[in-house]
Amino acid sequence: ASDDANAVSEVVYPQLGGLLTNSASVMTVVRQHVRRGGALTTSTRTYDVRVEFDGVTWRVVDVVPPTTLPGNAPSQAATELIAQLEPELPDTALQDLTSGSVDTRLVELLGRAAGVMQFSITVFAGGHPAEVYGTASPSNHTAGRGVDIWQVGGRSVFDQRGEPSSPARQLAELALAAGATEIGAPWDLDGPGGASFANDLHQDHLHLAFDG
């Protein structure tokens, strides 16, 4: 920062974006307050923070800045979703929506959910690894077909893991009923081979996506 600017950053939420034995992606929602002269601006962005385990501790080895998908203009449904969620949207997720690059099916699903519950989005595309972590397979996030949600009903998904009927589980069930083809969550809602799955990676968020 220049001499006449001061910045303070705060971590809103760190969420796993990929997990291997000795490395991980931690998608970190960061809110930054910058005062320049008499003006204060605030931005919230999601960064792909890469960490590695050296046998003793986990260390940050890279921070990948978010990018925005190319697009044109948001659909009416996306505009309405922004109005519903904007206080809970990181700027990177907002940019993906305003670019019109988020899949219509995903926008419609989130719009229905926002009508009945409150939730906070971590990431659509910007800030998410381009590939499924540790593989060469493109992520549905990269094409605007996936979303990660870290908080539902005012509580983190992580804190709702052990509850048989929680707001987070209700959102996952809504996505399953709506035809989402990937539902990563702390619970497997439809058994082996179905759209829903649970693993160590998806204990701290909901991953909702549609295949192309």
Roles of regions detected by a PLM:
Residues 102-136, 184:
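Extended, low-complexity, intrinsically disordered C-terminal regulatory tails
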Residues 77-97:
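Acidic/histidine-rich, surface-exposed loop or edge segments in extracytoplasmic proteins
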Residues 37-41, 137-138:
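Short consensus segments that form the blades of beta-propeller domains
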Residues 16-24, 52-56, 152-154:
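A short, structured loop/turn motif at beta-sheet edges
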Residues 2-39:
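Surface-exposed, charged secondary-structure patches
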Residues 1, 17, 124-133, 191-192:
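Acidic helix-start/capping segments at beta-turn-to-alpha-helix junctions
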Residues 50, 57-80, 100, 108, ...:
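Catalytic cores and adjacent binding grooves of peptidoglycan-active enzymes
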Residues 1-5, 96-101:
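Core segments of small alpha/beta cavity-forming domains
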